[in-house]
Curated annotation (Swiss-Prot):
It catalyses: D-glucose 6-phosphate + NADP(+) = 6-phospho-D-glucono-1,5-lactone + NADPH + H(+). Pathway: Carbohydrate degradation; pentose phosphate pathway; D-ribulose 5-phosphate from D-glucose 6-phosphate (oxidative stage): step 1/3. It comes from the Bacteria. PROSITE patterns: G6P_DEHYDROGENASE. One of its GO terms (biological process) is pentose-phosphate shunt, oxidative branch. Catalyzes the oxidation of glucose 6-phosphate to 6-phosphogluconolactone. One of its GO terms (molecular function) is NADP binding. It comes from Borreliella burgdorferi (strain ATCC 35210 / DSM 4680 / CIP 102532 / B31). This is Glucose-6-phosphate 1-dehydrogenase. Its EC number is 1.1.1.49. Pfam families: G6PD_C (PF02781), G6PD_N (PF00479).
């Protein structure tokens, strides 16, 4: 298949001197350039730091240093220009306009705090965007609001300047190879799609665990928590991909429609039952490999009485024909034993087995490993070599790095290229955002009485999460 590529465009990065830009966006753009996926483009950096173009390029080069490609980096840096500006000042946007080529497509990337989304979009719309509207796109990072109401306000703001097919709401988890492969694995292999339902699936477990705590980000995080920070976007996006019906064709519009149907089918949890479905946790200080790690409340003085969850485990159900009665266990947390993300699908045990004397668990499992090692694993049973008829569990593994020579090492590479090409399949739509916020906001309005369970920094999380499991179900080890 011919390599996807695009040329003749400008990308304006608002907040270009921030961490996201330096660590993710610029290296991803360089790799796309190195692999000849983009050409004849310009990166227009917009920020409040004072730089000449030369100083800006040296600043960018620090995040790209690779000895074997040094000459290529020098060529790449020639595509960069810098515009000094304040996100709230109209003169800054008038100055930016002078740098734009009205004959080329312009992608506006908002690598900023959400607090600046309003000023940036309003200034773009007011001063010059309307003159080249059809040649513009906008890419923005989460959070997409802090509630259903604010998400709707953000969507209204975006629609005042852009059409839906010009808006790209990025969720980097959707750019990971294993996540993308859920779609192909299901609908491209009949042996799996035929058992992808409540007749065969016992439960589904989605885990997004982070090893690091909130170092330096507690003031922002304390107003958000794990429910809004992780469940509303990453985890519900993964759930919708696993649970969706087959679209009538491989097209972004139809794929998004099926994902929305799943989100709208999530069963609301009553206030009376919420304690049986959700466990909230918060990490406390602990020794980790000989180093003391502070607890969440120890990060700053003002957190002394905080009940913000740094860990969340929950059980949800989907009210449709395919998944009725199948629990989906969702969990995410910070300050855990390791960085680890996966989707685990446990299949039901056969109603009858020939091997009643064996202690082996005869339920099979399918695992999508998202990080740290991208891959897919199938757990099955086999005869152990030897004179006796012993059965043991074995794993059949597929590794991306072992099977393919070239990978997108960074999810942003694929997502950026898709945006440049106008492919919104791996981006979230307004309907998805609002549907997920509707579910999450309903929980947030009901769970005030749930107590926070403490867990040690560097552990697996609070032990109380076992209380929400159905009979014979279990949590995977982190």
């Amino acid at each position: 298949m011919k390599e996807r590529s695009v040329s003749n465009f400008d990308i304006v990065i608002f907040g270009v001197t921030g961490n996201l830009s330096r660590k993710k966006l610029i290296p991803s753009l360089f790799n796309l350039f190195k692999n000849k996926c983009i050409s004849n483009f310009r990166v227009i950096g917009f920020s409040r730091k004072i730089f000449t173009d030369k100083e800006f390029r040296l600043y960018i080069k620090d995040s790209l240093w690779q000895e074997e490609t040094d000459s290529l980096i020098e060529i790449f840096l020639n595509f960069f220009v810098y515009v000094f500006g304040d996100f709230n000042e109209k003169e800054s946007y008038k100055n930016l306009f002078k740098f734009l080529d009205r004959s080329r497509e312009t992608i506006y990337y908002l690598s900023t705090s959400p607090a600046f989304y309003g000023p940036i979009i309003n200034h773009l719309k007011k001063y010059f965007l309307s003159e080249k509207l059809t040649l513009s796109k906008i890419v923005l990072e989460k959070p997409f609001g802090s509630s259903l109401e604010t998400a709707k306000k953000l969507n209204s703001l975006l629609y005042s300047a852009f059409k839906e097919d010009q808006i790209y709401r990025i969720d980097h988890y959707l750019g990971k190879e294993t996540v993308q492969n859920i779609f192909t694995f299901r609908f491209g292999n009949s042996i799996f799609e035929n058992i992808w339902n409540n007749r065969y699936v016992d439960f589904v477990q989605i885990t997004v665990a982070e090893e690091l705590g909130l170092d330096g980000r507690v003031e922002y995080y304390d107003s958000v928590g794990a429910l809004k920070d992780m469940v509303q976007n990453h985890i519900l996006q993964l759930l919708s991909l696993v649970a969706m019906e087959s679209p009538i064709k491989f097209d972004s519009e139809f794929i998004h429609d099926e994902k929305v149907k799943v989100l709208k089918s999530l069963r609301k949890i009553s206030k009376e039952d919420i304690k049986n479905y959700i466990v909230k946790g918060q990490y406390i200080g602990s020794q980790v490999q000989g180093v003391f790690k502070k607890g969440y409340k120890d990060e700053t003085e003002f957190l002394g009485n905080s009940n913000t969850e740094t860990y969340l485990a929950m059980k949800v159900f989907i009210n449709n024909w395919r998944w009725s009665g199948v629990p989906f266990y969702l969990r995410t947390g910070k300050g855990l034993a390791r960085k680890f993300s996966e989707i685990y699908i446990q299949f039901k045990k056969p109603s009858f087995t020939l091997f009643n004397n064996s202690s082996v668990d005869f339920s099979n499992a399918l695992i999508f490993r998202i990080q740290p090692r991208d891959g897919i694993e199938i757990k099955f049973n086999t005869k152990k070599p030897g004179y006796n008829y012993e059965i043991q569990t074995a794993n059949m593994e597929f590794s991306y790095h072992g099977a393919f020579k070239r990978l997108f090492d960074e999810a942003y590479e694929r997502l950026l290229l898709d945006a440049f090409l106008g492919d919104g399949t791996l981006y979230a739509t307004s309907d998805e955002i609002e549907s997920s916020w509707e579910f999450v906001s309903d929980i947030a309005n009901k769970w005030a009485d749930i107590e926070i369970c403490n867990y040690f920094y560097g552990s697996e999380g609070p032990k109380e999460i076992d209380s929400i499991l159905e009979k014979d179900h279990f949590w995977r080890k982190i």
